[in-house]
Regions:
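Helicase C-terminal subdomain and adjacent C-terminal extension
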Residues: 1, 94-96, 131-203
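Conserved helicase/translocase motor-coupling segment
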Residues: 1-91
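Active-site lining segments that contact anionic ligands and/or coordinate catalytic metals
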Residues: 3-6, 70, 116-119, 150-151
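Amphipathic coiled-coil/heptad-repeat helices and related helical stalk/stem segments
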Residues: 26, 30, 105, 138-141
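Conserved nucleotide-binding/hydrolysis micro-motifs of P-loop NTPases
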Residues: 80-83, 112, 126-128, 150, ...
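A short beta-strand element within the Helicase C-terminal
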Residues: 107, 113-128, 143-144, 152-155
């Protein structure tokens, strides 16, 4: 994430989830990563720009001292039930580390449209799903997930995204939201995942 390249972490060996959108085992892995990230006292490197978008000076700020209205970390999930668990996780992290109010937040992807944050940590919308459907494979929802962060993006998912997409039925249409009558969930998700650095953790 520190390089600015989006990263997908797939986690294998987890206990079964209660449902695709109620996955406490996966969120427990995510919470451990966030715990380490906050404890490491990372710094945020940036640039200031003039009114014409010309880069000015470089800045380096400890993440815990970052100022402004935007949160440093936004934890995003697709469905409301998953966000309820993410809210609880954010509350625990905030209390344990004495974080400023709003330093780390949780939200549904839909509610986070138009917002920005330093680092996005999101549960992939297809994680744990039996297959793509109109809701979890929507291109716009994935686009929001991938474009809210100014510095880094980490998607987490249960293992098996490639297999899920391989087994998804073909749908006629055009990929990546190009003009056409139907979007192609399988091709769209594959193209986007090809841009990610990928890692697998076995628990």
């Amino acid at each position: 994430m520190g390089t600015g390249q989006p990263t997908l972490l797939e986690v294998d060996g987890l206990p079964d989830a209660e449902a695709p959108d109620i996955d406490q085992p996966l969120l427990s892995v995510l919470e451990a990563y966030l715990e380490d990230l906050i404890s490491a006292q990372v710094t945020i490197h940036g640039r200031t720009y003039d009114a014409h978008g010309v880069p000015q000076r470089s800045t380096t700020v400890p993440a815990l001292e970052q100022e402004g209205d935007d949160p440093v970390i936004a934890v995003l999930a697709t469905r409301n039930a998953a966000v309820d668990d993410a809210f609880a996780m954010v509350a625990r992290l905030t209390e344990r580390h004495g974080l400023p109010d709003g330093w780390i937040v949780a939200s549904t992807v839909d509610s986070w449209q138009g917002q920005t944050n330093t680092l996005t940590v999101a549960v992939h919308p297809l994680s744990g799903a039996s297959g793509p459907d109109a809701f979890n494979s929507a291109f716009g929802r994935l686009a929001v997930t991938c474009t809210r962060a100014t510095h880094g993006l980490l998607l987490v998912s249960r293992a098996g995204l490639d297999e899920l997409l391989d087994n998804a039925p073909a749908v006629p249409g055009t990929p990546l939201g190009e003009p056409g009558t139907v979007e192609l969930p399988r091709q769209t998700h594959r193209r986007i995942l090809q841009t990610f650095a990928r890692a697998t953790q076995v628990v």
